[in-house]
Amino acid sequence: MKNIITMTLCLLVGSPAFAASSTLRDKTVMNIFELGIKAGKSQQYDEVASSNISSSLEAETGTLAMYSLKRKDDLNQAYMIEIYAGKEAYKKHVDSEQYKAFIERAPEIIDQKSKTDVTPQFLGDKRIVQNERTINNLVIVDVKPEHQQSFKNIVLAEMSDALKLEDGVLAMYAATDAENENRWYFYEIYASEADYQRHRQTPHFRGYIEQTSEMTTGKESIPVVPVFLRNKGAMQFDD
């Protein structure tokens, strides 16, 4: 991941119906941020991040989703995922009072920040109401160059089916590294662990695993727990 000062993540998304036009793709911006929290500042970080997320989702029509999550094995290692309707929506967020308050507190709470620039390939979600059962997954997959297009076709179809057919699948996002198109990032949200396990037994998921088993060179599943997840829901965009 590449160091950067800014701590935001942007995506352009489509309407509730699938949108795959070149216009949408050209406007889309997506970043994934990893943040190191200073020792003893984890609770303060959660409070500031949650306040920023709540205020932004309530006040900004173009802010479509903001997710705060942490590593299970190191709660001082955080991730922030944010989704906006476009560049103008992101600019409005950066100019907002809640974002400025977050940035003002950041130096006393955060000691490391990095960003991965990515290109969104699939963005789909439902309205999320987080509770103690909600889980999320963050996964990185490296695909063999010669299988990139086939992998993309298979995984996008699987994610679309999962959202349509499974009530417990709340959000699925896929993106590729802007500097290495063969590296894929997946962020998924499920209503519960039981819903995730049911998902793994579905024909579309098992078909995806079987069809892509020889297409990849590596997979890293980052152990994460949801801290504060908010979205507007009804997002569907595939490239």
Model-derived features: positions:
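An amphipathic, aromatic/His-enriched active-site/gating alpha helix that lines ligand/cofactor pockets
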Residues: 24, 51-67, 83-116, 163-170, ...
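Short, surface-exposed ligand-recognition loops at beta-strand->loop->(often short) alpha-helix junctions
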Residues: 36-47, 143-151
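Sec-dependent signal peptide recognition
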Residues: 2-10
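Hydrophobic h-region of N-terminal signal peptides that target proteins for export
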Residues: 10-18
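Short, well-ordered beta-strand segments in beta-rich or mixed alpha/beta enzyme
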Residues: 28-36, 65-94, 132-142, 171-201, ...
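Extracytoplasmic/secreted proteins, especially bacterial periplasmic and envelope-associated proteins
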Residues: 44, 48-51, 101, 150, ...
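Glycine-rich beta-strand-turn "strand-cap" elements at beta-sheet edges
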Residues: 20-27, 67-76, 101-136, 171-181, ...
